Each structure stands twice: as C-alpha cells, then as structure tokens.
Amino acid sequence: MTTALSRTSLIRREVNAQTRKVILVLGMHRSGTSAVTRCLNLLGAEIGSKLLPPAADNRSGFWEHADVMAIHEELLKDLGRVWHDARPLPEGWFLSPAARKARDKLARLIAGDFHGSALWAVKDPRLCRFVPLWREVLLESGFEAAALLAAPSAVPSSTSASISLSSPASATAPSGTSCSTS
C-alpha cells in the first residue's frame, strides 16, 4: 500500500520532470476554494508559508497566502474598488501604474516564495478579477498556469451558514438583499 507521503513524492517527481506549473484556484467567498486548495497542498502543491490564520467562519483555515491577499487588496484600493464591489474594474486598469506596481510585487513574491517549486497553487477570491495580470506575471516567471474554478452553486447556503456563525443574533441577510438557490 502506498502511503500519502510517497504519493506526494511521486507527484512532485512527475511535475519536476515537466514544465513548472501553478494552479489558480478561482471562486468567490464560501465556494469551497479553501478545501480545494488544502487538498491540492496535501497532494504536493506548494502554497507558501505565510498563510492567513483560521477564523470562526473557517476553522480549518483559508489556505490563502497573506501577501497575495494584501497585493490584491492594495490593487483594488488603488483602482478605487473594494473586494465586495461588483462593478467592473476601470477601463485600462491592466496598463495602469497600480497594475504595474502589483505585477512587480507578484513577480517578487513568486521569485521569493516559489522559485524552487515545480507545482504550486494560489487562492484568493479576488484572484478572479486579476487573472490577466497573473497570466502575464506567471508567463514571465516561467510558470504554466491552469485554472480550477469552484462551482458557485454552494455559495448561498455556505454564506448563510457563515453569517449565522459570525453573527449569532441575526442569521438573516442585510436589509435589501436576498439569497436564493432557485
């Protein structure tokens, strides 16, 4: 019987013989991306060491690189947006000074944290908005990217459960909003 450790070693050896790869785990909050990212990590994908700590609404952990989240947050702020803003990014954002700054920071992060990695994964709900930026940085860094998209069908019930965990006095959505699975 093969142990989990030897399976991980086999996966890493196979990947080392091929192109360096990164898996972009894409999905909104509460869509299962934390579980998917942790599974990828257990199967041998590096995720970095500077991870967001677990929280009351995600006791198993988010499995998100804290610096990636900070870079995304700064870019959103520089573009006049916030994480929960549904508006499109501004016209020409990709060529803006803010995007160039984020691109440089991501390149440094990748070179520092994942330079020796043949396979790694990155997850942050904000990542969906910045895929073009990531594709460019990864290509320049010598990585081939693959995207793994979390199905959004679980989001309403998971979000509802999260709201009730974080605010026991009120498990309902804020006034003027609704969640429906139909």
Regions found by a protein language model. Give the residues of each.
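PAPS-dependent sulfotransferase catalytic core
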Residues: T2-R103
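A general, composition-driven signal for non-globular sequence regions
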Residues: M1, I23-L24, S117, C128
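PAPS-dependent sulfotransferase catalytic domain
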Residues: R103-S182
